[in-house]
């Protein structure tokens, strides 16, 4: 019997490349040939890397006049818009742009040559410069937790366009707006943000801004209205993301908006409500006050251009984006969630971590650990315990709950009428309690040397209408100010090498891990059911996340009920199940919060844990690589995932699980395109001697498999 896995597309990159980026290779297999460059010609500036290009006019004013998908040979831009719109002291001001385009359906070079600057705009392009990409913030790398070293900052080029006030326009006199761009090597990705410098001699208020405005070609034409429109084939993400969803969609309708284009009079949609205009702006505020001589920076927007409609391929592109602009997500320590924070339990956990190969301990919720206790006795105690762990090569950290708490005393968020906090309750980070809370976090981590931190709830984006809190003035600036408080803390942690697990989408601000995506009450189900559901969670959670970006949860002790049927303790009495959980997780390269008081309780338990930790560390580079989704677990047949890394000696690792009570023997057809192999593959099962297989024209091999009942096998592909 054969199972056919859908052949993955894009076997050859078509389209022209620049002189410095000629490469016939798929950029997802090898992007090294696609090097960023910036060129000026005929009053135009072109940023390109051979995969995409963005073209700007330099005269008569600065504007985006082209955005090309070179891979597919298509133009994405249909109309010229301002580079940005900034409202200062209540006055909306366009930054750059050109006017005079006859229709908004498409854009020609002839029209561009006849277009004029927007005379309503109080700014004009006065300077531009190119350079190398600078780091957004410091990152102290933990190479011992990474499969391979990655560059920081990412490689690529930057361009800054400076717009100054036009003469005789008083509203913008003394203001300077810079539009910043970055393009990255080896990936069709561009970043943009704006900054404002106040040289007016008086305080200004940045009421609002739109930092990206792009009129993309619509993905479909429909005369009638629709509930769900197909959007242009790009992926947009900002570093202004929150909401507790543990999904990249945290940006949408918080900082990323698809809206109708009021200038698009000739669109097919009769009511002209089709979203064909991308705007990147905060949902409220920022209402930021900028002192004389001060400056303001917006959030950053990244646009990733897709070259396919294939879900796996677009997911691989998104995962490569995170490795490029947030490479700390590749840190993937093996960790334990310790349920008791007394000294004896912590030292015992450290010793067990050494024996098993675990690398990190988090003092779990309900353990008795309280990071807000900054008494000198508590600080000294945890400094001694941290030093004890560090001397043995183990890192120590703890858990803290932020959102969903009710503080009282005027310190909670004051919501506008008819609105509730995301989690029902939440303190305001700008209240005096909030300011003291973060002072305690900084002090505790600095004093004790803690090098990992789990921040539950985080900041979900709740606004606050109070005008009595010291950290914000009122409703309009409350979200922006609170977000800055928490992201400043996360960036500080990242610079110190403090590993962050945060159940929200804070990756671009320093977080390394969020929830993979699971229902906590499922860990109270019978053990056998947990095994398959666990693998389903991993399969579903790794379309947009790398294995290292999502944590799973394994309650070694009873968790939210379920009794003895759901519980792994005593560990030695449930070795087959414990072993299956270890195989599920380490075989996927996914770390779990192993929550309990110990990792082993007998020599045979210790050997089982050591077996799978050693397996993970031996194959860490390939197990931390992207997952190709082969067959989703359903309890009816084998399920499988394929790790692929064409740059590694081990090009692939195929994990196959058999949930059935009888062996499964069959020929499995597997597409190994993303391993980078094209003619032959040497495949070895469970570290046995390998066999040579021919790869067909669809990049598939036929692999005979024989998986024992309730077992698993792994296959190394070279």
Predicted regions and their residues:
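Conserved structural scaffold segments of CAZyme catalytic domains across common CAZy folds
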Residues: 25-26, 100-411, 435, 590-636, ...
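Active-site-adjacent "subsite" loops/lids of carbohydrate-active enzymes
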Residues: 326, 342, 380-387, 391, ...
